[in-house]
């Protein structure tokens, strides 16, 4: 059996930044660090942070006054921020800058009372945070998940309408939904390029290339990871047998019967150690040394926000 690794795979710049913020906060603050929701959707990462003393909560009311709170990489609504301020919490925002970019645009639409359509998955924390940027009672924000939703959608003023997207969607499906929106609402405005992030795009392109070679594809990521699920869906759409696994423990040997090429990728919130463990397991049962595919080299780095520079400065001074 041959192992083929996609490039790029695993952590994106937004996830790396979020984890760095938490690790820095743990070194600087001599009190419990609370994180609202899972920092990123990967159980290995969450368990690792828990072992370091981090406490995860779903509601701000669960956090004692004057504590340190970190908002997850998915972002939060304006209401959540207000709740944190009311409790006089020390706020560290780990929202991905690409998600924050969408927040800013939705806020602008809200300020102008321009009706707004968000393409995304209902219940996902990023979607809830983005919808929560729109608070103008004279306007409205709508969520669509499919072309059918577009067909059933009614707005108050189709001549003054904006759309935005969740950052971790399927490229192909999103383009179809946008086309349906533009067909139904010819005067709708949106970003020149959909808001799907570079990392999501790069990983989906890599999986499509991988599917031309692999007999089976393992997507390493947690079940609640949107971008990991999209990678698994894409693999299946190409006709390649594809499985979303959280670790090597999920692999069943029967899947590998008569398999020559095993493809491996990892969602943007999955650490490389999980990839390494999968490779080690496959090597033990007879697979050859992995081959790396040539792919896009991601150079993007998201800096820590100015309000957190004091953390970095303290760390630098302490060596």
UniProtKB/Swiss-Prot annotation:
- UniProt keyword Iron-sulfur present: yes
A single GO molecular function term of this UniProt record: metal ion binding
Q: Which domain of life is it from?
A: Bacteria
> Where are the catalytic residues?
126 (proton donor)
User: Which terms does the UniProt entry file under GO BP?
Assistant: dimethylallyl diphosphate biosynthetic process; isopentenyl diphosphate biosynthetic process, methylerythritol 4-phosphate pathway; terpenoid biosynthetic process
- Keyword set, alphabetical order: 4Fe-4S, Iron, Iron-sulfur, Isoprene biosynthesis, Metal-binding, Oxidoreductase
Q: What is its EC number?
A: 1.17.7.4
Q: Which cofactor does it need?
A: [4Fe-4S] cluster
**Record Pfam families:** LYTB
Any idea which positions bind isopentenyl diphosphate? 41, 74, 124, 225-227, 269
Task: Specify which residues bind dimethylallyl diphosphate according to the UniProt entry for this protein.
Answer: 41, 74, 124, 225-227, 269
Entry's InterPro entries? LytB/IspH (IPR003451)
**Which note does the record give on the cofactor?**
Binds 1 [4Fe-4S] cluster per subunit.
Which residues take part in binding (2E)-4-hydroxy-3-methylbut-2-enyl diphosphate?
41, 74, 124, 167, 225-227, 269
Which residues does [4Fe-4S] cluster bind?
12, 96, 197
**Do the record's keywords include Signal?**
no
Any idea what job this protein has? Catalyzes the conversion of 1-hydroxy-2-methyl-2-(E)-butenyl 4-diphosphate (HMBPP) into a mixture of isopentenyl diphosphate (IPP) and dimethylallyl diphosphate (DMAPP). Acts in the terminal step of the DOXP/MEP pathway for isoprenoid precursor biosynthesis.
Q: How does it assemble?
A: Homodimer.
Cite the HAMAP family for this sequence. Answer: IspH
Question: Which family does the record claim for this protein?
Answer: Belongs to the IspH family.
Name of this protein: 4-hydroxy-3-methylbut-2-enyl diphosphate reductase
Q: Which organism is it from?
A: Buchnera aphidicola subsp. Acyrthosiphon pisum (strain APS) (Acyrthosiphon pisum symbiotic bacterium)
């Amino acid at each position: 059996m041959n192992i083929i690794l996609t490039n790029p795979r695993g952590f994106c710049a937004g996830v790396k930044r979020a984890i760095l913020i938490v690790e820095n906060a743990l070194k600087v603050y001599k009190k419990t660090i609370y994180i609202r929701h899972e920092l990123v959707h990967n159980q290995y990462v969450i368990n690792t942070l828990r072992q370091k003393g981090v406490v995860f909560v779903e509601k701000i009311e669960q956090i004692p006054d004057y504590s340190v709170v970190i908002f997850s990489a998915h972002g939060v609504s304006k209401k959540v921020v207000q709740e944190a301020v009311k409790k006089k919490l020390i706020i560290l925002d780990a929202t991905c800058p690409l998600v924050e970019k969408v927040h800013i645009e939705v806020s602008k639409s809200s300020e102008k009372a321009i009706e707004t359509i968000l393409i995304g998955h209902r219940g996902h924390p990023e979607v809830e945070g983005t919808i929560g940027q729109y608070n103008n009672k004279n306007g409205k924000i709508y969520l669509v998940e499919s072309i059918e939703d577009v067909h059933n959608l009614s707005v108050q003023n189709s001549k003054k309408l904006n759309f935005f997207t969740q950052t971790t969607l399927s490229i192909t499906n999103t383009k179809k939904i946008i086309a349906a929106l533009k067909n139904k609402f010819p005067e709708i405005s949106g970003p020149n390029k959909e808001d799907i992030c570079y990392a999501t795009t790069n990983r989906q392109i890599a999986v499509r290339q991988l599917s031309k070679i692999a007999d089976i594809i393992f997507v390493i990521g947690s079940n609640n990871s949107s971008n990991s699920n999209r990678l698994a869906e894409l693999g299946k759409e190409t006709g390649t047998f594809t499985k979303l696994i959280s670790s090597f423990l999920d692999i069943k040997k029967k899947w590998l019967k008569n398999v020559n090429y095993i493809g491996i990728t990892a969602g943007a919130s999955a650490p490389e150690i999980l990839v390494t463990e999968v490779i080690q397991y496959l090597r033990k049962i007879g697979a050859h040394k992995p081959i790396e595919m040539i792919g896009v080299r991601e150079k993007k780095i998201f800096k820590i926000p100015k309000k957190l520079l004091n953390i970095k400065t303290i760390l630098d001074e302490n060596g």
